[in-house]
Amino acid sequence: MEEFQRYLELDRSQQHYFLYPLIFQEYIYALAHNHGLTRSILLENSGYDNKSSLLIVKRLITRLYQQNHLIVSANDSNQNQFFGCNKNLYYQMISEGFAVILEIPFSIQLMSSLERKGIVKSHNLRSIHSIFPFLEDPFSHLNSALDILIPYPVHLEILVQTLRYRVKDVSSLHLLRLFLYEDPNSNNLITPKKAGSSFSKTNQRFFFFLYNSHVCEYESIFVFLRNQSSHLRSTSFGDLLERIYFYGKIEYLVEVLAKAFQANLWLFKDPFMHYVRYQGKSILASKGTSFLMNKWKYYFVNFWQCYFYLWSKPGRVYINQLSNHSLDLLGYLSSVRLNPSMVRSQMLEKAFIIDNAMKKFDAIVPIIPLIGSLAKAKFCNVLGHPISKAFWTDLSDSDIIDRFGRICRSLSHYHSGSSQKKSLYRIKYILRLSCARTLARKHKSTVRAFLKRLGSELLQEFFTSEEQILSLTFPRVSYTSRRLYRRRIWYLDIICINDFANHE
């Protein structure tokens, strides 16, 4: 117990983060809007436009704190004017900068943690595809998995309390409360329509930060208890998740379970346990029996309710057998399938045929949901029959072909880890014929005429495969690249899920 108490010692030197003065620094808003920097696909903003000057920010915060400007009627909640502009525009502008400021202490601690562990290329860990190699080898030896829907906080104040001991100055916390209670999109953090994907695109950075800090709160204690019960310590869990606010809860757990600590931690001693989180969900896979998985199920429900005030129910945690169930994971259908093989053995004059079945992690493209996404975007109907893209008929021919080609290459790149890439040919066919129908509609001609006129160009644009990309990247090993193309390839440059692959 003394070892646990030493681990729970508060590091007072890390509590003194005074972030409020940074709100008035103009370069913070330039960073938030990626002004002068490379734009991020995930955090794409409308532009800087000199709207974040120091004078405007000071005046705006002063006006926001005045009570008469915080009382907004239901009829003009979206049209309340500050300085002749829309109120929500200013909330968005400052909250984006505020999100950058809140990330500073966590980023500093994360970088120091990665340096201690000797992880040089930490940006590779941001890739969505890095999840699949983590699962590929262990899942072939596991039996069951918990498919968990992560509960959301029941009150916005819980989000503020999560950051209370990390962000020391009270002014920053008051401003955070102001953003949460005044922003109409903040309700998505409590009652989301779609788990992890319902945040407004105008303020994603702010809400993603709050959501991740909320989820990491319980994950930090979960991994701490797991590490104390196993000699095989977790190496992929960074110090970023160890918030000062969590220590009080951990101390309470240690105090309650002091007399029978080891007896209560038997559940964590499964050496074959793997946990991964994505899109408001998490997966806990284990080699344990159905009885053990049911114990895990009720443990999570009680853990959330008793210690983190998160209402949940057993129906949000599903127990699935990996041998006969596929996991809908980041645009892939992942499962563990049996790969049968036959071995002929010769002993003296007798021959034996031995049937052997090996488990293999498999990830395929869910073709039906993908066609549904294309139908929603008006590239085809619900049956997968290509239709013209009417909104693009005002563009030039080269722009139309380029747009369809980029979508096709993006899908091929994202689904490069699929073991059945031939299913992507149907998607390429839909996009190619939709492009031809769009061009034919623009020029008031027939599809046959355009396919005859631009057939070779369309083929070159839509069937640039990953094999060709690999041969350009590794020109001296073209044969090896062709072999690699037939296998799964996980890339380390994919930081957000493809829009068409997001079926949540």
Curated annotation (Swiss-Prot):
Protein localization: Plastid, Chloroplast
Chief place where the protein resides: plastid
Domain of life, per lineage: Eukaryota
Keyword entries, A-Z: Chloroplast, mRNA processing, Plastid, RNA-binding, tRNA processing
GO molecular function annotation: RNA binding
Keyword Nucleus: no
GO terms for cellular component: chloroplast
Matching InterPro entries: Domain_X (IPR024937), Maturase_MatK (IPR002866), Maturase_MatK_N (IPR024942)
GO BP of this protein: mRNA processing; RNA splicing; tRNA processing
One Pfam family cited in the UniProt record for this chain: Intron_maturas2
Role summary: Usually encoded in the trnK tRNA gene intron. Probably assists in splicing its own and other chloroplast group II introns.
Family: Belongs to the intron maturase 2 family. MatK subfamily.
Protein's UniProt name: Maturase K
Native source species: Berzelia lanuginosa (Buttonbush)
Organismal lineage: Eukaryota, Viridiplantae, Streptophyta, Embryophyta, Tracheophyta
